[in-house]
Amino acid sequence: MKDYIVRAIAADSQIRAFAAVTTETVETARQDHNTSPVATAALGRLLTAGSMMGVMMKGDKDILTLQVKGDGLIQGITVTADSKGRVKGYVGNPEVIIPANAKGKLDVSGAVGNGFLQVIKDMGLKEPYVGQVALQTGEIAEDLTYYFAASEQVPSAVGLGVLMNKDNTVRQAGGFIVQVMPFAEEETIAKLEENVQKIQSVTTLLEQGHTPESLLEQVLDGFDIEINDTIPTEFYCNCSKSRVERALISIGRKELNELIQEGKEVELNCHFCNTNYEFSVEELKEILRKCK
């Protein structure tokens, strides 16, 4: 099954909801970055959230960036998404290995540490929207739940999960974001809270064969659900040699001259997809000619 996101409303539009299966997306990230299991789980959770939060935006050129800045060994996580379901991301230390937590699970919280979650929305305005909250648990889903309530004043339930195979490939990945609208009735909120309390973990549900649609049926049990949209999602990086060339032009003539004087080819790496781009001395001279 290809990865996709569903967008839905429930309870006469008192609730809006998103759910996603992102197994291939997270596995692509794992392969690109050669991440350890705990780094895969942490990055995978944020990629899943990013894909859903990206499609919440309306504009074709809108860009969402999620940054987890913690003092743990993972050395931060960065994810960028657009409004079309395309997402990319990386961790500071992809090789991080720490002991399992008390439940015997991958210790994402321990790898992340204490710090902040930052949400940046670039919607083509003069200044991007920036919201920042302190990390609550470092488990990602709870931190986003807190962000929505504290920074956007939208009561939300966020569930995210990544399950690994024994060979460290990704077995399951996905999640949901369910949000209560300002005009929601008390009984709607109470029923939703009750559902969230009793629901099984995202990875358990995915392992049982649940789709994004049936994930929402679990979270929104007892509500009328209307699926509005189905959006493919994928790990996608828009880097290219010409984009990297533009970055080289932007460093200026002085630095470019110094690189040329060294007489060696230059290798630049894209953080998001780990692709290396090589530029020969001749190519650097050509780039220098393009500099103003």
Where are these regions (language model features)?
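Interaction interfaces in information-processing and related assembly proteins
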Residues: 1-229
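Cys/His-clustered metal-coordination modules, chiefly Zn-binding fingers
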Residues: 197-292
